[in-house]
Swiss-Prot record:
Region (A): 1-336
Protein name: Chaperone protein HtpG
Gene: htpG
Localization, UniProt: Cytoplasm
GO cellular component entries: cytoplasm
Family of the protein in this entry: Belongs to the heat shock protein 90 family.
Length: 623
């Protein structure tokens, strides 16, 4: 450490308010799972060592020592537990930033998830949110972190009791890396016991590629550092030598999750490009799963050396896949920029995607409850592939699951086609914001009355992909919000003797009153209980138009079509008014806004709608 650094004074900093809340959440909500603190600290040490090794590929000055390891030293006499590594280390500013602040949104999301999670699921949230370091305060009254950045001669000690503040003090460390010293609480003595520590390491960190040593005290009082983990790359072993428990432990290690993997894929590819892959399909959904910014974090290794988890080894709609791909066909010093352009990676990506797709398809055909649960968790993102992955769109459509008006069970498109009525040439669907809203939509009335099944699509991407898929098994996909004459081809299965009003004069009267607010006004057979509905005449359906407007995309004005039900009492009454020569102008806008409300559309003038409705209701109320 330089003389300049030793002359610097200690600094006191306040935790950000978010860290204070986070510490309280972690310490109190996860108390019964305190052993995970060691898993998180060891995982952080391994990540730091991986990072230094990678950076040393392009800067030899950062090279790791030959005996690089993660060292765990319990000291019962001092009630201290030390975890040391030879990793990349942290600067003064990185210590303050990484250990003293956290994004406000991250804290809030973490708290919400923690409160909602079952007790057995809470530990997994620590790793998923990247806040594992703070788990140390479950077992320690004070935590000291001494770190020296690789390539620097300065070291600093970050210290805190987790009660609102931390200090940064100049320190000394002979080599780059980090030492974390936990000053243990009185009720945490078990974590100073070598046997207990070894069992935790075996449970959570046995397959970390770096050697983990544990300092043992012999009977004569001397100490010895002994190997505590196997340190063998699990994926390099034959499948016959790996137990399901070992697969599950490795999955939990690499994913920071606690669920059991839904499926495990372990294979070696040989040919033009050779690689070994160990991949997992999760059974539980991560907290940030639906974020578009989230990417797959499959680890790419070259000859067992971690290179990156940003290689995009599967398309974004497969971002739930976890695991490792290891190859000898790439150079160790390949840059991340060059990596994306290499044909080797392109071949690996294609092979991995094909294998994962095949596994999902195979399990879908088994049609067990396990797949339906998997689909409920991950189907919303898999359907992104219907929108963005032209190469695999048809295969995805073959195993995709959907809700429909037929029953509460999930169905496939093949199920739908097998039940199509004679003369039906299209697959009907309705998109919207929620399944409950779709089930009660006025758009379905005429289809239900004629026994025509309709797919109910309520995920965000459902507003987009039907346009790209366009057809399945030569059957076009058709939104029920499009104005079309399909319903007139089918007789109603429900007896309806209600007489329809003559709306020949009402239709043009409403159209004149509404002007360019609508494209047209039409009498319809699609309604059985509602008075009105809005539809579109080709182009994007109503939901897609709404999504495009929300996202700020420029789009031409697309006035809706207002369809009226000639059998509804309100429409009959308005038809009588027109026949008597009375105006329906005040009613026209209310009818259009009523149809918009039914469809979940925003009203252009909510105040005006309220006033008009109140005025119209005042007449009958006064009688």
């Amino acid at each position: 450490m330089s003389e300049t650094n030793t002359q610097k004074a200690a600094e006191k900093h306040e935790f950000s308010a978010e860290v204070g809340r986070l510490l309280d959440l972690v310490v109190h909500a996860l108390y019964s799972d305190r052993e995970i603190f060691l898993r998180e600290l060891v995982a952080n040490a391994a990540d730091a060592t991986d990072k230094r090794r990678f950076e040393a590929l392009t800067d030899s000055a950062l090279a790791l020592p030959e005996n690089a390891s993660i060292r765990i030293n319990p000291d019962k006499s001092q009630k201290e537990l030390t975890i040391s590594d030879d990793g990349v280390g942290m600067t003064h500013d990185e210590l303050a930033q990484n250990l003293g602040t956290i994004a406000r949104s991250g804290t809030r999301a973490f708290g919400e998830k923690l409160n909602a999670a079952k007790p057995e699921d809470r530990p997994s949230l620590i790793g998923q949110f990247g806040v594992g370091f703070y788990a140390a305060f479950m077992v320690a009254d004070r935590v000291d972190v001494t770190s020296r950045k690789a390539g620097s001669d300065e070291a600093w000690t970050w210290s805190s009791d987790g009660k609102g503040a931390f200090t940064l003090t100049p320190a000394s460390r002979s080599t780059p890396g980090t030492d974390i010293v936990l000053h243990m609480k009185d009720d945490a003595d078990e974590f100073l016991d070598s046997w207990r520590l070894r069992s935790i390491i075996r449970k959570w960190a046995d397959h970390i590629s770096w050697p983990i040593t544990l300092r043992e005290t012999k009977e004569d009082g001397t100490t010895e550092d002994q190997a505590a983990n196997e340190g063998t790359a699990l994926w390099s072993k034959p499948k016959s030598e790996i137990t399901p428990e070992q697969y599950a432990e490795f999955y939990r290690h690499i994913s920071h999750a606690f669920d059991e993997p839904y499926a495990t894929l372990h294979w070696r590819a040989e040919g033009v490009t050779e690689f070994t892959a160990l991949l997992f399909l999760p059974s539980a959904r991560p907290f940030d799963f639906m974020e578009q910014s989230r990417e797959s974090r499959i680890h790419l290794h070259v000859r067992r050396m971690f290179i990156t988890d940003e290689a995009e080894l599967v398309p974004n709609w497969m971002r739930f896949v976890q695991g490792v791909v290891d190859t000898e066909d790439l150079p160790l010093n390949v840059s991340r920029e060059m990596l994306q352009a290499t044909p080797v990676l392109a071949r690996i990506r294609k092979a991995v995607t094909k294998r994962v797709l095949s596994e999902i398809s195979k399990r879908a055909k088994e049609a067990d409850s396990g797949f339906n649960s998997f689909w409920e968790n991950f189907g919303a993102v898999i359907k992104e592939g219907l929108w963005e992955d032209a190469e695999h769109r048809t295969e995805i459509a073959g195993f995709a699951r959907f809700h429909s008006t037929y029953s509460d069970d999930l169905i496939t498109l093949d199920d739908y086609i097998s039940r199509m009525k004679d003369g039906q040439d299209a697959i009907y669907y309705l998109t919207g914001d929620s399944l409950d809203a779709l089930k009660s939509s006025a758009q379905l009335e005429g289809f239900r009355a004629r026994g025509l099944e309709v797919l109910l699509l309520s995920d965000p991407v459902d507003g987009f992909w039907p346009e790209r898929l366009s057809s399945y098994q030569e059957k076009p996909l058709r939104s029920v919000t499009h104005s079309h004459g399909d319903l007139e081809k089918f007789e109603s299965v429900e007896a309806d003797t209600t007489e329809a009003a003559d709306v020949e004069k009402l239709v043009p009267a409403l159209k004149d009153a509404l002007g360019d607010q609508v494209k047209d006004v039409r009498s319809t057979v699609r309604l059985t209980g509602s008075a009105v509905v809005i539809t579109s005449d080709g182009g994007p359906d109503l939901t897609m138009q709404r999504l495009m407007r929300r996202s700020g995309q420029a789009m031409p004005a697309m006035p809706p079509i207002l369809e009226i039900n000639p059998k509804h009492p309100l429409i009959k009454a308005l038809a009588e008014r027109v026949a008597k020569g009375e105006s329906v102008k005040d009613y026209a806008t209310v009818l259009l806004d009523l149809a918009r409300v039914q469809e979940g559309e925003p009203l252009p003038d909510p105040t005006g709608f309220g006033r008009s409705l109140a005025t119209l209701l005042a007449g009958p109320a006064a009688e």
